[in-house]
Amino acid sequence: IEFTQKAYDLDSVNEIDFPASENLTAEGILENSATLSNVRINDFSPSEQFYNQTQSIRAYYSFFDVDVDRYMIDGEYTQTFLSAREINYDNLGEDVSWLSKHLKYTHGYGITLSRVDAITATGQPKMIIDNIPPESDTQDIQVKRPEIYFGESTDDYIITNTSEQEFDY
């Protein structure tokens, strides 16, 4: 461990104790309102299920993973769930062939992005980016190139710029 810390230049890090208090006061809440307003109330698994139920949109698209990221929205860092809409070759049915897998269905399309700290009136994730083509409810984040050629489960080769037309959603 000592040599790993040296290799990553972590051997000169200053450690400082941060005393935590278990006493929550109104004053403490007010002083930390930005942090508390960004507390995650959603979870990965239900969000992924919701994305697959409502945002796959086509049978051959799936969401395989949900990541947490922060984006600047309305001047504040906002914690979000992010997931890529990927091609799911298992759902192509009879249309799975070398041509369809490597020349035609070459990419997923778009993402979903939802707040971790907000839900709709029906208890669903509050979407920031959804639909095909991607629609954003904020000017701060716009998807300009929604094609996803490499993702969580997209691990096979494809060939582009051929006479076969790539399928876009």
Language model feature labels by segment:
Residues 2-169:
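Soluble extracytoplasmic regions of secretory-pathway and membrane proteins
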